[in-house]
Amino acid sequence: MANHKSALKRIKQTEKRTERNRHVRSTLRTFIKRVREAVAAKDANLAKEALAAAIPVIDGAASKGVIHSSNASRSVSRLTKLVNTLS
């Protein structure tokens, strides 16, 4: 356990950030899953709507530093490619 006041503060800050990042990552996974489920169901309209909803969430996670910007770009690219297979 930390003895210094500053170390105790950093522990609290880390816990807060971890919880916030966990929430963002969970939301991100949910939106990606919705796109994949729509594609699996071969529902083009639902897949496009799900993709349109997922892209801002992915970009938001990247801007908050939860995922790397390259990871976000790759995810958006792959999901878009997946949705375009239905058209």
UniProtKB/Swiss-Prot annotation:
GO terms for biological process, alphabetical: translation
Tell me the keywords, alphabetical order.
Ribonucleoprotein, Ribosomal protein, RNA-binding, rRNA-binding
What GO molecular-function term can you cite, just one? structural constituent of ribosome
Q: Which Gene3D superfamilies match?
A: Ribosomal protein S20
Q: Please provide, in alphabetical order, the Gene Ontology terms of the cellular component aspect for this entry.
A: cytosol; small ribosomal subunit
Compositional bias (Basic residues) spans?
1-11
Q: Which spans are transmembrane here? A: none
Query: Does the entry feature the keyword Ribonucleoprotein, yes or no?
Result: yes
Superkingdom: Bacteria
Question: Which region ranges are annotated with the description Disordered?
Answer: 1-23
What does the protein in this record do? Binds directly to 16S ribosomal RNA.
Q: Give the family from UniProt.
A: Belongs to the bacterial ribosomal protein bS20 family.
Q: What is this protein called?
A: Small ribosomal subunit protein bS20
The organism of origin for this protein = Geotalea daltonii (strain DSM 22248 / JCM 15807 / FRC-32) (Geobacter daltonii)
